[in-house]
Amino acid sequence: MEGNITDGLKYVGAGLATLGMIGSALGVGNIFASFLDAAMRNPSAAPQQTGNLFIGMALAEALGIFSVLIAILILFVA
């Protein structure tokens, strides 16, 4: 009986850890929406801001990748 409760709580913890991907997805969406809005207002400045776009996207995606990594660690190591 003890092992079943522990296994169940492990799955709940892994599921909660993956909720960080929601924030990552919202962040990437906001970054691209803001970039496209700015590019439509001032097309001549868009090429200069593309590097900033990809840096911001990479930082936002890193948080989602870290949350998946934590979920995998909870499932297979703990």
From Swiss-Prot:
One of its GO terms (cellular component) is plasma membrane. It is found in: Cell inner membrane. The record marks E61 as: Reversibly protonated during proton transport. The keyword Membrane applies. Its main location: membrane. Keywords: ATP synthesis, Cell inner membrane, Cell membrane, CF(0), Hydrogen ion transport, Ion transport, Lipid-binding, Membrane, Transmembrane, Transmembrane helix, Transport. One of its GO terms (molecular function) is proton-transporting ATP synthase activity, rotational mechanism. The chain crosses the membrane at residues 16-36, 57-77. It comes from the Bacteria. InterPro entries: ATP_synth_F0_csu, ATP_synth_F0_csu_sf, ATPase_proteolipid_c-like_dom, F/V-ATP_Csub_sf. It is a multi-pass membrane protein. F(1)F(0) ATP synthase produces ATP from ADP in the presence of a proton or sodium gradient. F-type ATPases consist of two structural domains, F(1) containing the extramembraneous catalytic core and F(0) containing the membrane proton channel, linked together by a central stalk and a peripheral stalk. During catalysis, ATP synthesis in the catalytic domain of F(1) is coupled via a rotary mechanism of the central stalk subunits to proton translocation. HAMAP family: ATP_synth_c_bact. Belongs to the ATPase C chain family. F-type ATPases have 2 components, F(1) - the catalytic core - and F(0) - the membrane proton channel. F(1) has five subunits: alpha(3), beta(3), gamma(1), delta(1), epsilon(1). F(0) has three main subunits: a(1), b(2) and c(10-14). The alpha and beta chains form an alternating ring which encloses part of the gamma chain. F(1) is attached to F(0) by a central stalk formed by the gamma and epsilon chains, while a peripheral stalk is formed by the delta and b chains. This is ATP synthase subunit c. It comes from Hyphomonas neptunium (strain ATCC 15444). The gene is atpE.
